[in-house]
């Protein structure tokens, strides 16, 4: 509907506001009505439904109209309704009503608040007013509107909050605090900040000045638990006992089954019952005396079957302990903390503070409060080969107890024997000195093993055919123990550690051991020698050795075994020195031919025999062993495992010489085999031709006999005139047969002569060819020897020109680099040859010993040609070719 219309129809229970523009006054027109608008009037809004407040509802109107005592609306002189500005009016259920100009619906129609049982509204007065009972209410007053009921709002009253009642269950209490001075539900006066408990079961609605802090649950107490409490301030508890600030006490099930801590009680915790069995005891520190106070510094011992609670301030020393039940092999070391007396009657014994004594089983023992158990001792079982070190604490003397079960006395303690770190490491390894002596240490870190019990007697099992030296520093003497035996060290005894050389070449202090093996055994060494013609060679020698003792019971004789700490290094150095001296006086060629003999004589030396030679002089004979008198070491044999040139050029020249000798021998054998095959072929062919001629002769002879028989038969058959003719014919046939036989015989003789001539010719041709081949081979051998001499002379002149120092520097630089290169490649043995050259490995040892062809059986000399050994050099004269580290091919 447009506001400019002149006729406005107002339905029932609707209203409009009309503004008189002349007087600027607004009024209300209520329907049902048809209102005709004047020209000076303006409709402010279309018809609006009146406000209808249903039952149990209310609304709030701001700036309400003023009414008189009869409820009539008041108007001012201008005709404008009079308003109560800045005021509020709460209107409850009534007939529909319009809003006058200036009135504002502050709060829409709202249901009245229903307050349920156990619920209250916390109200506060905003203005001073008088309630319906005529009592004056001052602004700021607070009170509760408790249910059940319906709360009628008032403009002077503000609803702060809704308060719910708190349900207090069994074994619960409600903790309250006063916000200001007031009276509680029981009528007791409470001051501001005071706290108290409400223990009554049920719903509790706090008063307006009561503040609910929390619900306190009761602590359920049993026979095994108690409640530890402490007073926050002076007060009287629920049982009427006066408590002081800081006082602590226990509440047990004998006092109450469920305890609700008061507001002045602080719960320190729940204490469990302490239960002792028949074999338990405990020591209580600072026990509570009859006056209820802790006796500081005192102790109390409880034993046996009982249960109790530790009072506040009491504590257990080391908790609940078991009664010491001692067997025959057990004991207790005790110490007196205070003077005390033990026993009864004549067995009464007094102890001063600090005394130590030992009690032995079997018994049950509970230490009194004045006695401290230092330790529980057990008898130490010892076998015949076991022992312990015991030290007397009074005298300080240490002794070893071996072979019997032993319990320490009160004045004895176990003594730890310290060993040098090297000895500890050797004992912890647990290696067999005989079986594991060849193992190399892959790492410097020792393997983790069980640490040695230092109180146990140190034992070491000496293997068979070995010896161990033990030195007593107290007696200042040594003893030697031969295996198999078990060595037990005394308190002042120590092992003699041997530091031996090992490796190839020998490195000093490479192996440490406690026992000395007596042999027989062997060790290997690598030495570098130089011949008279400055040829440097590397030898790998192996020596068999053992120790000789005339009397093992003689201390001086046995002490000689350990007089040389490193017998391996000492022997290797001595032998290497002898070998270098012997080889330095011979040339390379002589050493190559007689290397084994030279080395053996250098190592073992010579001795004079009774046998006299033709010149009436004693012939020196090589010894068969070398003896070191310092320690009785005997070297019984020496094995030359390898001989290898150090200089690369020497090695190459030797290799070429060996290859050339192999080629010459191969060519010679090939020519001899070819000649033998041709000779055998010619002989077979001659025998075949001769057999053919003999067969033809036999055939002709048979034919002649056949003809004779035919002639005889013809003569018998023919008679008469035919006899002469037959005889003539027979004679002619006979003559013809004889001629044929003679002709065949002559042919055979001619063929035989021709064959023999051919054989003679072929034989002479072959002999000439063989002589030619032999001369050619001899020329080649001579050429090779002359070339070798030229090479040797050239090498000698080059050596003299370069000088020993330059050659030594060159020789050291090259081989070391090549050896390192081969070692980095992981090669352990090397042989350089081609695929078509055979190598004889059967005569290696003979060629190594310098025997060569003398030790070989003589070869069968083939018929028709010279022997290979007559025209060629022996293979054994060639230089040895090293195969790996242990074999030499001559």
Curated annotation (Swiss-Prot):
Residues 425-455 are annotated as: Disordered. It is found in: Cytoplasm; Nucleus. Phosphorylated on Tyr residues after EGF stimulation. Keywords: Cytoplasm, Isopeptide bond, Nucleus, Phosphoprotein, Repeat, Ribonucleoprotein, Ubl conjugation. One of its GO terms (cellular component) is nucleus. Pfam families: MVP_shoulder, Vault, Vault_2, Vault_3, Vault_4. Its main location: cytoplasm. The keyword Transmembrane does not apply. It comes from the Eukaryota. Residues 434-444 have a biased composition (Basic and acidic residues). There is a cross-link at residue 444 (Glycyl lysine isopeptide (Lys-Gly) (interchain with G-Cter in SUMO2)). The vault ribonucleoprotein particle is a huge (400 A x 670 A) cage structure of 12.9 MDa. It consists of a dimer of half-vaults, with each half-vault comprising 39 identical major vault protein (MVP) chains, PARP4 and one or more vault RNAs (vRNAs). Interacts with TEP1. Interacts with PTEN and activated MAPK1. The phosphorylated protein interacts with the SH2 domains of PTPN11 and SRC. Interacts with APEX1. May interact with ZNF540. MVP 3 mediates interaction with PTEN. MVP 4 mediates interaction with PARP4. PANTHER family: MAJOR VAULT PROTEIN (PTHR14165:SF3). Required for normal vault structure. Vaults are multi-subunit structures that may act as scaffolds for proteins involved in signal transduction. Vaults may also play a role in nucleo-cytoplasmic transport. Down-regulates IFNG-mediated STAT1 signaling and subsequent activation of JAK. Down-regulates SRC activity and signaling through MAP kinases. This is Major vault protein. It comes from Bos taurus. The lineage of its organism: Eukaryota, Metazoa, Chordata, Craniata, Vertebrata. The gene is MVP.
């Amino acid at each position: 509907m447009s506001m400019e219309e002149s006729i406005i129809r107002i339905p029932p229970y609707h209203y409009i506001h009309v503004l008189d523009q002349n007087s600027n006054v607004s009024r209300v027109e209520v329907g049902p009505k048809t209102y005709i608008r004047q020209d000076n009037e303006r409709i402010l809004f279309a018809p609006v439904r009146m406000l209808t407040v249903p039952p149990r509802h209310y609304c709030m109107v701001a700036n309400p109209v003023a009414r008189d005592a009869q409820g009539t609306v008041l108007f001012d002189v201008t005709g404008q309704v009079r308003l109560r500005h800045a005021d509020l009016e709460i209107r409850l259920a009534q007939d529909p009503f319009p809003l006058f100009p200036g009135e504002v619906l502050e709060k829409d129609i709202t249901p009245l608040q229903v307050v349920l049982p156990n619920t209250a509204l916390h109200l506060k007065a905003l203005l001073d007013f008088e309630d319906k009972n005529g009592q004056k209410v001052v602004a700021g007053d607070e009170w509760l509107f408790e249910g059940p009921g319906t709360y009628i709002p008032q403009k002077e009253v503000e609803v702060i909050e809704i308060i719910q009642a708190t349900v207090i269950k069994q074994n619960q209490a409600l903790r309250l605090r006063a916000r200001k001075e007031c009276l509680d539900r029981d009528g007791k006066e409470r001051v501001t900040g005071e706290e108290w408990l409400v223990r009554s079961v049920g719903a509790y609605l706090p008063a307006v000045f009561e503040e609910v802090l929390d619900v306190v649950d009761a602590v359920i107490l049993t026979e095994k638990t108690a409640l530890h409490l402490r007073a926050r301030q002076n007060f009287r508890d629920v049982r009427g006992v006066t408590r002081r600030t800081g006082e602590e006490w226990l509440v047990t099930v004998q006092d109450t089954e469920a305890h609700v801590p008061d507001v002045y009680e602080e719960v320190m915790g729940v204490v469990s019952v302490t239960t002792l069995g028949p074999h338990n005891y405990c020591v209580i520190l600072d026990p509570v005396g009859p006056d209820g106070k802790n006796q500081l510094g005192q102790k109390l011992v409880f034993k046996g079957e009982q249960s109790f609670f530790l009072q506040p301030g009491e504590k257990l020393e080391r908790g609940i302990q078991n009664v010491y039940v001692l067997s025959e092999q057990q004991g207790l070391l005790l110490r007196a903390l205070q003077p005390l007396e033990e026993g009864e009657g004549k067995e009464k014994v007094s102890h001063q503070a600090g005394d130590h004594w030992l009690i032995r089983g079997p018994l049950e023992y509970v230490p009194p409060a004045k006695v401290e158990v230092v330790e529980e001792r057990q008898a130490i079982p010892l076998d015949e080969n076991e022992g312990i070190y015991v030290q007397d604490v009074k005298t300080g003397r240490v002794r070893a107890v071996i072979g019997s079960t032993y319990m320490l006395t009160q004045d004895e303690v176990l003594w730890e024997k310290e060993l040098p770190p090297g000895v500890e490491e050797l004992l912890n390894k647990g290696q067999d000195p005989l079986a594991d002596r060849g193992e190399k240490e892959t790492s410097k870190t020792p393997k983790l093993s069980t640490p040695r019990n230092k109180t146990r007697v140190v034992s070491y099992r000496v293997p068979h055919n070995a010896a161990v030296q033990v030195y007593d520093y107290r007696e200042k003497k040594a003893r030697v123990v031969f295996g198999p035996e078990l060595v037990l060290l005394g308190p002042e005894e120590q092992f003699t550690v041997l530091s031996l050389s090992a490796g190839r070449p020998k490195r000093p202090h490479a192996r440490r051991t406690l026992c000395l093996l007596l042999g027989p055994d062997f060790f290997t060494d690598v030495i570098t020698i130089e011949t008279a013609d400055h040829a440097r060679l590397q030898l790998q020698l192996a020596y068999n050795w053992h120790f000789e003792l005339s009397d093992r019971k003689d201390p001086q004789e046995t002490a000689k075994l350990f007089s040389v700490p490193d017998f391996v290094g000492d022997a290797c150095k001595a032998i290497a020195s002898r070998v270098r001296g012997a080889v330095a006086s011979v040339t390379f060629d002589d050493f190559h031919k007689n290397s084994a003999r030279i080395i053996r004589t250098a190592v073992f030396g010579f001795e004079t025999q009774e046998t006299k030679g033709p010149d009436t002089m004693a012939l020196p004979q090589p010894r068969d062993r070398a003896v070191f008198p310092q320690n009785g070491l005997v070297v019984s044999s020496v094995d030359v495992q390898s001989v290898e040139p150090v200089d690369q050029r020497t090695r190459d020249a030797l290799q070429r010489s060996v290859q050339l000798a192999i080629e010459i021998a191969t060519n010679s054998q090939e020519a001899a085999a070819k000649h033998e095959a041709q000779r055998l072929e010619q002989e077979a062919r001659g025998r075949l031709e001769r057999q053919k001629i003999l067969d033809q002769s036999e055939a002709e002879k048979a034919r002649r006999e056949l003809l004779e028989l035919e002639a005889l038969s013809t003569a018998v058959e023919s008679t008469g005139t035919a006899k002469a003719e037959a005889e003539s014919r027979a004679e002619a046939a006979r003559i013809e047969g004889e001629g044929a036989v003679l002709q065949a015989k002559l042919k055979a003789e001619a063929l035989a002569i021709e064959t023999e001539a051919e054989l003679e010719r072929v034989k002479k041709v072959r002999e000439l060819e063989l002589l030619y081949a032999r001369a050619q081979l001899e020329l080649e051998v001579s050429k090779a020897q002359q070339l070798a001499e030229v090479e040797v002379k050239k090498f000698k002149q080059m050596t003299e020109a370069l000088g020993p120092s330059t050659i030594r520097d060159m020789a050291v630089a090259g081989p070391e680099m090549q050896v390192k290169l081969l070692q980095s490649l992981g090669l352990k043995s090397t042989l350089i040859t081609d695929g078509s050259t055979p190598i004889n490995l059967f005569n290696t040892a003979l060629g190594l010993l310098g025997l060569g062809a003398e030790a070989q059986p003589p070869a069968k000399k083939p018929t028709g040609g010279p022997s290979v050994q007559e025209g060629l050099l022996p293979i054994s004269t060639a230089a040895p070719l090293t195969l790996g580290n242990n074999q030499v091919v001559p």
